[in-house]
């Protein structure tokens, strides 16, 4: 509020962007042994940071499908981004703590009737960890350990339940500055274990069906840090 008690934010604004216009292609490839192959490429013009109107890769992967099991190599949604997410008109994600991220990964999935098991090794590309030097790939690159994810999901009709856990191990720095600006080599690591819980319950009300769900919860908490 200003000195007269008026809302300083009560000013309308409007815009029209083409940043999220998408170009993509889906290809069904030939069989490799007993596996069906498919490829997906998708891009928009969001760029990164403040560099707007620049081509950005959203999805770029190859998938090998053996029926019950499948192997994906490339960039797609982070495994912590679950199947339960609000439908919104805006571009902002409407779920708190939703890990809205696409990342390069090697992902294996096994499906048996209503159950699905997922394991993945994930790297960082567009969505980066925050550290002493700001957002950077260096923390996970110097760690030499990718993000490791395992999870299980159950689906029966509209009912969907899932749980997953990830290990993220980073090296925030390899040197420190002491007295008289002397530099010292340090060996520090911080390890975090984000978790995901999802639940989607369809409830019929009259002739319509309403979906009531517990939104995905993902929170990265440091479990331990080691330094020498």
Which residue ranges define each predicted feature?
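Outer membrane beta-barrel
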Residues: 1-128, 142-149, 153-160, 200-204, ...
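Outer-membrane beta-barrel translocator domains and adjoining extracellular loop/strand segments
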Residues: 50-55, 83-91, 128-140, 144, ...
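Detector for outer-membrane/organellar transmembrane beta-barrel domains
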Residues: 156-228
């Amino acid at each position: 509020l200003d000195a007269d008690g008026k809302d300083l934010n009560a000013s309308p604004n409007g815009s029209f962007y083409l940043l999220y216009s998408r170009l993509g292609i889906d290809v069904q490839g030939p069989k490799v042994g007993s596996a069906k192959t498919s490829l997906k490429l998708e891009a928009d013009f969001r760029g990164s940071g403040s560099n707007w109107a620049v081509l950005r890769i959203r999805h770029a992967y190859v998938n090998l499908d053996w029926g019950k099991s499948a192997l994906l190599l490339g960039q797609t949604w982070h495994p912590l981004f679950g199947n339960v997410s609000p439908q919104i008109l805006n571009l902002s994600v409407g779920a708190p703590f939703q890990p809205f991220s696409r990342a390069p990964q090697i992902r294996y999935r096994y499906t048996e009737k209503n159950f699905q098991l997922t394991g993945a090794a994930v790297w960082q590309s567009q969505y980066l960890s925050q550290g002493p030097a700001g957002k950077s790939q260096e923390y996970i690159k110097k760690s030499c350990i990718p993000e490791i994810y395992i999870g299980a999901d159950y689906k029966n009709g509209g009912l969907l339940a899932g749980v997953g856990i990830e290990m993220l191990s980073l090296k925030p720095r390899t040197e420190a500055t002491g007295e008289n600006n002397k530099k010292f080599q340090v060996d520090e690591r911080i390890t975090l274990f984000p978790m995901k819980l999802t639940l989607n319950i369809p409830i019929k009300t009259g002739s319509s069906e309403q979906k009531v769900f517990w939104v995905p919860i993902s929170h990265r908490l440091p479990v331990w840090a080691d330094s020498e």
